[in-house]
Amino acid sequence: MSYQDINAATINRWIKEEDWEWGKAISHEEYIKALNGDWNVKLTPVKFVPHEWFGDFKGKKLLGLASGGGQQIPVFTALGAECTVLDYSDMQLENERMVAERENYKVNIVKADMTKPLPFEDESFDIIFHPVSNCYIENVEPVFKECYRILKKGGILLCGLGTEINYLVDESEEKIVFSMPFNPLKNKEHKEFLEKLDSGYQFSHTLSEQLGGQLKAGFTLTNIEDDTNGAGRLHEMNISTYIMTRAVK
């Protein structure tokens, strides 16, 4: 079984057994609020994405990349976007299907591994919404290249990205214990740490990989915001461990 398959199975289990925060679909009431223009979405754990980062949704073709769960895509649909969601977790996609059926709207649901070429034609989308998820893949730069390929000229890429700080520290977030890069495929200690926490396979990525990767793909970065991880000692000390970015093709 590939590490990607293990991660998908892990996320399915988190949703079934652990009431995972990012696997909870929005309620009917939240959907109605979005229809009435009262909405917010997240790319990273705490901060909401500024509305001005999106522009007008009406008639825009939007891809939620590794964005299953029924949290953001229903909102974008309510605001007038034509949405596609790609994820590798069956449970995350089932949440999307459930909300779409409940609220009676159409969404294109695609099960695919984002480490492979994305199953879309060139210049298919106006917006790609890519919340924190590339911590579950080893190489991020090919994903940014694929995003550039499938976005229309002038299209917007919105990303939630974790920093290396998340992977430096021990479980209590009190000591720096791991050297970088954090890669359980190459480091037994990293693998054992993740197995102890039932965290699947996760990987650190540098700013050169994540910001530089977008620039190398051809994007122009227009906005960056810091964020914390929402809980734990690093959060309590207001240490930023995530960033959200807006880039344009």
Question: Model segments located where?
Answer:
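Conserved class I S-adenosyl-L-methionine
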Residues: 156-189
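Conserved alpha-helix/loop element of class I SAM-dependent methyltransferases that forms part
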Residues: 25-60
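A short SAM/SAH-binding and catalytic strip from SAM-dependent methyltransferases
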Residues: 126-141
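A short acidic, Gly/Pro-enriched loop at the edge of an enzyme's catalytic core
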Residues: 115-128
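Short alpha-helix
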Residues: 201-224
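A short glycine-rich, Lys/Arg-flanked "PGG" loop and its adjoining helix->strand segment in the class I
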Residues: 141-156
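Core SAM-dependent methyltransferase catalytic element
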Residues: 217-219, 233-249
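Class I SAM-dependent methyltransferase SAM/SAH-binding core
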Residues: 60-117
